[in-house]
């Protein structure tokens, strides 16, 4: 399911990446220089199945197996911007997928803890990330399992992102709330047939939610 090349060469397909950033991302209002630099530097073709390599920079999500997808480039850039990543932020990612969103967050300086529900995708993501930056998965944590279950481990995060849609808003008793530090941000889609992207910001004993508009993601599994 991953690219057949043994290494990810950032010097290949540079013009395609530049066109993607200009026409799909900047044109839609993304101005964060760090996010734009990340999107320009990461070879997206190394994070899609080899059969879709020629379509890697198209303005749409692509299948990666198990009815999962790699998100549209703009969606990755938008969500990365909304997280307001600061260097050293501990970020919990639900749904490693192909590893592309992880790569963008890593480029922004995040310390990643990422969970993938499908073991073959987990293994492929590690291969993809290692081709991109050898040794990177040894310096961060990528595990196979359930996101909510992993949060019961007692770790705390400045930022959390779900790449799959929750069925309901998490309350203050949820592992999401308990694992997010005060002042932290949780970004997630919610809904079944109709979905919206939500941003939650935690205070000391509560959190606020804001809807950011309609989106379409695969449902969260492993609950």
Give residue ranges: language-model regions.
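Class I SAM-dependent transferase core
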Residues: 2-92, 100-104, 108, 121-124, ...
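Conserved nucleotide-cofactor-binding alpha/beta core module
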Residues: 84-208
């Amino acid at each position: 399911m991953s690219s057949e090349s043994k290494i990810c060469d950032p010097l290949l397909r540079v013009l395609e990446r530049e066109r993607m950033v200009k026409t799909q991302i900047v044109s839609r209002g993304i101005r964060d220089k760090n996010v734009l630099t990340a999107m320009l530097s990461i070879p997206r073709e190394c994070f899609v199945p080899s059969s879709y390599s020629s379509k890697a920079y198209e303005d749409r999500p692509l299948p990666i197996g198990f009815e999962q997808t790699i998100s549209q480039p703009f969606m990755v850039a938008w969500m990365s911007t909304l997280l307001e990543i600061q260097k050293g932020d501990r970020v919990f990612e639900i749904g490693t997928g192909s590893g592309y969103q992880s790569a963008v967050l890593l480029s922004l300086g995040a310390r990643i803890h990422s969970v993938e529900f499908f073991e073959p995708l987990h293994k492929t993501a590690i291969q993809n990330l290692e081709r991109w930056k050898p040794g990177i998965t040894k310096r961060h944590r990528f595990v196979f399992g359930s996101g909510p279950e992993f949060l019961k481990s007692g770790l705390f995060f400045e930022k959390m992102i779900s790449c799959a849609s929750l069925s309901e808003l998490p309350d203050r008793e949820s592992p999401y709330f308990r694992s997010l530090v005060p002042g932290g941000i949780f970004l997630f889609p919610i809904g079944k047939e109709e979905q919206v992207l939500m941003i939650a910001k935690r205070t000391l004993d509560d959190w606020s939610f804001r809807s950011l508009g309609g989106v379409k993601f695969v449902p969260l599994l492993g609950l």
